[in-house]
């Protein structure tokens, strides 16, 4: 299963490379790092798993971050792009109906307030799957929130960095900005963790200035693996993509 998940991600990355070719969406090949502040053994186990799967990965404990790490896995040949620019570019070749909520799905027919749309196949990619009578996704997903600040006059870290701990921090650059993420938590708890990130930036990047901040809220699966595939065993030609 791990190999299947890996192969699916590699295939998706290659597809994005093809789609982004010639597209104005700031696509960049980058090296990704997963680091641990205090658990070198966890990083070594990750490297062992990669070796068994035949995936190139390297150990390093030298990162351009403002704190020491116990170790990190270095993944070459990864990528990042600007999602809104990508959507704006690819939407030029699509038919998009805005302000048209789907009230119900009957087979492969979507029922709206303005009429019906019938297709050969339907993919529900609505963040949270809205069809509750199939799939039981309400019991298999939880809401997860995280925070980001963008800093100018901050270092170029030349890569994408994420802590293996869910409560850790992430770092990457976009043009002349450093994006610092963290403060992750399930919804329902007190949020607004930007101040935690601002305090971190003040300590470690005192010459930097915040240009913007935002939060993300995602539907996450119970084991961290997205649900992508048939909506349920009883719904043919109906698919779902959620949990990421």
PLM regions: where:
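C-terminal catalytic lobe of FAD-dependent flavoproteins
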Residues: 49, 165-166, 175, 186-244
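Helical element adjacent to the flavin cofactor pocket in flavoenzyme catalytic cores
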Residues: 19, 41-51, 70-121, 125
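Helix-loop-beta segment of a Rossmann-like dinucleotide-binding subdomain
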Residues: 24-34, 59-89, 183-184
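Dinucleotide-binding Rossmann-like beta1-alpha1 core, especially the glycine-rich loop
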Residues: 1-61
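Acidic/polar loop patches that form or flank catalytic/metal-binding clefts of enzymes
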Residues: 96-99, 131, 156-162, 207-213
């Amino acid at each position: 299963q791990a190999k299947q998940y890996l192969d699916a991600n590699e295939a998706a990355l290659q597809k994005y490379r093809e789609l982004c070719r010639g597209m104005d969406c700031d696509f960049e090949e980058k090296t990704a790092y997963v680091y641990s502040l205090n658990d070198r053994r966890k990083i070594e186990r990750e490297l062992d798993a990669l070796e068994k799967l035949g995936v190139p990965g390297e150990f390093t404990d030298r990162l351009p971050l403002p704190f020491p790490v116990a170790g990190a896995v270095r993944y070459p040949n990864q990528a990042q792009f600007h999602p809104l620019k990508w959507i704006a570019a690819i939407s030029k070749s699509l038919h998009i109906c805005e302000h048209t909520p789907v009230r119900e799905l009957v087979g492969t027919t979507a029922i709206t307030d303005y009429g019906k749309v019938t297709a050969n196949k339907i993919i529900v990619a609505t963040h949270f799957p809205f069809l509750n009578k199939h799939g039981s996704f309400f019991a298999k997903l939880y809401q997860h929130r995280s925070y980001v600040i963008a800093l100018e006059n901050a270092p170029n870290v030349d890569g994408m960095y994420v802590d293996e701990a869910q409560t850790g921090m992430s770092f990457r650059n976009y043009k002349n900005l450093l994006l610092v993420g963290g403060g992750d938590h399930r919804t329902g708890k007190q949020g607004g963790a930007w101040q935690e990130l601002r305090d971190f930036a003040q300590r470690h990047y005192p010459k930097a200035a915040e240009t913007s901040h935002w939060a993300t809220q995602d539907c996450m699966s119970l084991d961290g693996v997205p649900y992508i595939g048939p909506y349920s065993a009883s719904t043919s030609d109906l698919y779902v993509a959620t949990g990421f």
